[in-house]
């Protein structure tokens, strides 16, 4: 049951649609390298499409009815878009769910120090990373610093053309014999992933008893104060992420792919939001969820295990006049969901890690993973065969190219998504996303055809499920 390459069927008009979609996606990927920025941009997209903040609806005491479009944000890191359909909410929703946090390095709360006449910022890695990926590459600092007076300072240094960049040094090959003999996981100690941020000391009189003990660090702090009006202590209440510097780019002489940071999982989040916005009138209410903390287990107030989704649905059902606890439970259990997350693209260089009959191939369309997990499907959501059949029918009716796959060979490893968390309500859920190469590396690869088919598939699901 080999699936064909999606590129072979495209008309000139479809190629034009594909390129337009991917131009927007490249801009989104380049400009939104943190979950906060993704949500901020998602809200802007929604408002431009006529969505209204749910908090405004509640404050004004308005009722919700079919055709109304609302959004809700959670701590600036989650976003829920809702398009109310003509069917009673109790009959369930059609849901897309993706995450917008990506593997990265986070600054520690007390990060600044000086060593070897250079200023550094200490980090703690976030998510599943290979430490050796992060050395000797241009890096940017993106995030927020929250001050005691209640103000928030946005930080974004390293992505503009005239910005300085940062880096983590690597050991020169001439002195690396011991390092090169270590397993890859030990070659670069995660504790020494320290970002170089300065190399120039402040001027001072050597006889001055008040001269700074760390003059290069002090110069960095002085620059920070001058440019952003923040003190060293403000790092205690900061969330600054170290991410690769530079934009997403077309890849290949044929420009068929995109190289960028954060395809996992913004390559699913962006087409999900677009599909939600582009679907006009629906019978079953459509919902798109953009969430945080998936890379570390979906925990905390902004992870999928929080009550944000459930609470927001309860608010909406109350405003729509369906406010009984039983109606809420029925609505959740009768819902259908595509858990939109990336899959492992088949890589010929590592062919032994895949089983090709059930592998995701680049350019063959939207991926469906009936189950994920590892070592006997542990920790997975295993979609019902009846639901898989329904999804197949929707995709075929809409002419969407899709493929079914697993995340590598049996016992080769594995992974998980938010699917099992949503399935606890009793709703039907299947994992559905885009195949990528170099997953969790600084620069991941996605095929434009797969992004286009993801958008088409997500839109068809919202309209027809």
Where are the language model's segments positioned?
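N-terminal hydrophobic/helix-forming segments and targeting peptides
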Residues: 1-465
